[in-house]
Amino acid sequence: MAQLSVEQFLNEQKQAVETALSRYIERLEGPAKLKKAMAYSLEAGGKRIRPLLLLSTVRALGKDPAVGLPVACAIEMIHTYSLIHDDLPSMDNDDLRRGKPTNHKVFGEAMAILAGDGLLTYAFQLITEIDDERIPPSVRLRLIERLAKAAGPEGMVAGQAADMEGEGKTLTLSELEYIHRHKTGKMLQYSVHAGALIGGADARQTRELDEFAAHLGLAFQIRDDILDIEGAEEKIGKPVGSDQSNNKATYPALLSLAGAKEKLAFHIEAAQRHLRNADVDGAALAYICELVAARDH
Amino acid sequence: MAQLSVEQFLNEQKQAVETALSRYIERLEGPAKLKKAMAYSLEAGGKRIRPLLLLSTVRALGKDPAVGLPVACAIEMIHTYSLIHDDLPSMDNDDLRRGKPTNHKVFGEAMAILAGDGLLTYAFQLITEIDDERIPPSVRLRLIERLAKAAGPEGMVAGQAADMEGEGKTLTLSELEYIHRHKTGKMLQYSVHAGALIGGADARQTRELDEFAAHLGLAFQIRDDILDIEGAEEKIGKPVGSDQSNNKATYPALLSLAGAKEKLAFHIEAAQRHLRNADVDGAALAYICELVAARDH
């Protein structure tokens, strides 16, 4: 794909994800306030990087990305639930997310907890409902298994728990990497891995794509830490320097700003190399990789 | 089964569930405090009525209940997560559960939220991991789909959200029944339905067992409300009359105590009738039904 058509592809897919997410909430028969709270955070915007990784991987393997749409939405629901719960007063106690009041600020803590619980549970339902002809039962089961592992007590939840436990302590680089590999890495990796499963990647492609995603995940987090120091407040939608003032371990704090930038470049290069080795139509994935390296919010 | 062997069967199954639950947590590679928080509430006791309903239904259909054990544990994990989240300060704000300090009292709010999130996610993983030979992929997918529906934003989470919204308001009987059918009913019904799926029930048996479970679920809740008035504090492990003092809608409040007892008897009889109509070896299910009618905690 040419650069222009890559951008167009990603814009179209992002739109498809956002339309599908809204429909999935609309069709629910449940208390109105619960639906509103779930929709509020799902529709609060964001880069939709996880669904786009999945859909771009499916596309890179020559399959119709529409087949992966429900799984892409499931991933975004789980990502969104994690943001809602992370923002709670007893967790990170954030009032703003993407420049808007956080879920509990609008709907109250109880409803925010329930909206998160609802999104997490609903995500699994979406994958079960896909037609057997589009994704066979055994592959859907594998998709659910890997999603639960990526999101659960050996994945994202483990990362968040380690993050909570590490607050106020001086972390080593390996402890910091444990947190990031779990808190954000596992779900980013899952996004690509699920795309490989849906797209029918062979063993070698799957291995290279998994490596691509692992490096991309670390790059993503390092960039996040750098942005916290360099980014403009209005662009990232939260107070700049909040990590420093919260005394949180970050890559720049452990490696210096220059060292963090070097590490970012290393992981981006490694990601691009593994992507090339995967021998897929990876233009959209390469473009996402560039966006992560250069993103300013 | 004779009465004695029924009691023995249920005790053995309860033991099997508790052993399996502990093993499932032990095997996790994750932060120690997260595992402790998850295990604490899982191991806090309770009647294990949901897993026992599932395993007794599998047994009633002539199959080995061991086949259903991972699904029984998944149900108990989801039930336990819901208790942890319901007890949080922003929800019911309970300090005691089964006579022991609630999860957030011991591990803090953040870890309690994460323990709940972890249990919910892990529950789905357990079902995916069952061998194809024991439960085929298409049935496992159905089990996951129904579990997500029973627990999610059209099931248990909807009931809890409606309950939160109804606090301090005067509810009608139909609003109260909506809350109970969702908050506790859906998961009790799922327990029997999952047993029917695993045990290979035919359409008529499934229908009768579903009806059995629906009536049992309502009976369970009515008995709970009656206990809140009549029960001894040390037996139920929370202050007696807490519903009244919290101004919560209950069956006795809406129907009088005598009216509630009449309704309890009606649902127990209907449950037993549907169980007989299912033409299964239902001794253990009938016994659980009697326990619900007579339970004093």
Swiss-Prot record, chains A, B:
Sequence intervals crossing the membrane: none
Binding site for Mg(2+) 1: D86, D92
Chain residues that bind isopentenyl diphosphate: K47, R50, H79, R98
Binding residues for Mg(2+) 2: D86, D92
Domain of life: Bacteria
Gene Ontology molecular function: (2E,6E)-farnesyl diphosphate synthase activity; metal ion binding
A GO biological process held by the record: isoprenoid biosynthetic process
The UniProt record lists the keyword Protein biosynthesis: no
Main subcellular location: cytoplasm
Note describing how the cofactor binds: Binds 2 Mg(2+) ions per subunit.
EC number, UniProt record: 2.5.1.10
Sites where the protein binds (2E)-geranyl diphosphate: R97, K183, T184, Q221, K238
Pfam families (UniProt xref): polyprenyl_synt
Record's keyword terms, sorted: Cytoplasm, Isoprene biosynthesis, Magnesium, Metal-binding, Transferase
Catalytic activity: isopentenyl diphosphate + (2E)-geranyl diphosphate = (2E,6E)-farnesyl diphosphate + diphosphate
PANTHER family according to UniProt: FARNESYL DIPHOSPHATE SYNTHASE
Name listed for the protein in its UniProt record: Farnesyl diphosphate synthase
